[in-house]
C-alpha cells in the first residue's frame, strides 16, 4: 500500500501536478519557520515572454523615473491574494494592454527564498496593444520587435537570455508544459524527487515519518540561507540523512510549482528533481546508506515511472532554476 501511495505521488509530481504540503521533513535550526507574507518577508515577480509567428517579441517601454524610456519584458510584483497566473495576466494587461494565457513556466530565478521570479512563455488572447496615447504610470507603450533586433536602451540585459530560452523552447521543448498548481502552502519549501540510478534502476529518497512520502524541506529566511540560495534547504535535508562528503548532489530543476495565494497563504512549493551519485568512480549498484530512521530509499519498480524518471534525468527535462 505504501508503495502504491508513493507511486501515485511520484506520478502526480512527474505530471506537473503535485500535492498539498501538510508538514516538512527538514527545517532551519531554532524556531519553526513562520508563514511567509507577500510585501513583508517575500517578494514574487512574474514575467512574460511573448513570441509571435513572425519571431517578434513583445516589449513594454518603462514609465518609472529610474528607467523611463527603456524597454523590458512585461513584468511586475505579485499582490497579496493573487494566484501566479492572475498576477501575470494583470501585469500584461496593465503594461501592454493585452489579455493573455500562459503556455508554460520557462524558468524560475531566485535570490534566496525571499525573492523569486517566475518566467512564463505566454500568448495573447485579446485586448488592444497599448500605444503612447495610453501612457500611464505602468508603462509608456508596448510594441513588437524582431527577436534579433531589439530596441535600445534595454532596462536590463537579463531579458536577452529569457528571450532565447523562449525561442529554444518553441523550436524544441525540453520539458512538458508546466503551469502553477493552485495548492495552498504557508512556507517557501521544496518537495524533493531525489534519485540514485544504477544501470536501468532508479531509487527515490522518501520520508518515513507517518505515511511514506516524497520529502519536503522548508526554506529559511535567515541571512545564511538567503546568501546560499534555495539549494541550501535541499542540502540541509540530504545532510540530515546522508554522508555528503563522498557524494555528488545535483539539483536538475523543477518538475512543478504549487501556490494559491488566497486566505493569507503566500507560500510556494517547488517540486525539484535532484540526483545523488558517488563521488568516486566505479560501479555502485546500491544507493548510499541512509542514517537514522526518518528517511529510506524506495526502489521504483513500476516500469512506466522508471522510464519517465530516466527520460527526465537524461534529457534534463525540467524547468531551470537560476540565481
From Swiss-Prot:
CDD domains membership: NUDIX_8DGDPP_Nudt18
Residues annotated as domain Nudix hydrolase: 37-167
GO molecular function, one term: 8-hydroxy-dADP phosphatase activity
A GO cellular component annotation in the UniProt record: cytosol
PROSITE patterns reported in the protein's UniProt record: NUDIX, NUDIX_BOX
One of the protein's GO biological processes: dADP catabolic process
Cofactors named for this entry: Mn(2+); Mg(2+)
Catalytic activity: 8-oxo-dGDP + H2O = 8-oxo-dGMP + phosphate + H(+); 8-oxo-dADP + H2O = 8-oxo-dAMP + phosphate + H(+); 2-oxo-dADP + H2O = 2-oxo-dAMP + phosphate + H(+); 8-oxo-GDP + H2O = 8-oxo-GMP + phosphate + H(+)
Keywords from the UniProt entry: Hydrolase, Magnesium, Manganese, Metal-binding, Nucleotide metabolism
Descriptive protein name: 8-oxo-dGDP phosphatase NUDT18
Native source species: Homo sapiens (Human)
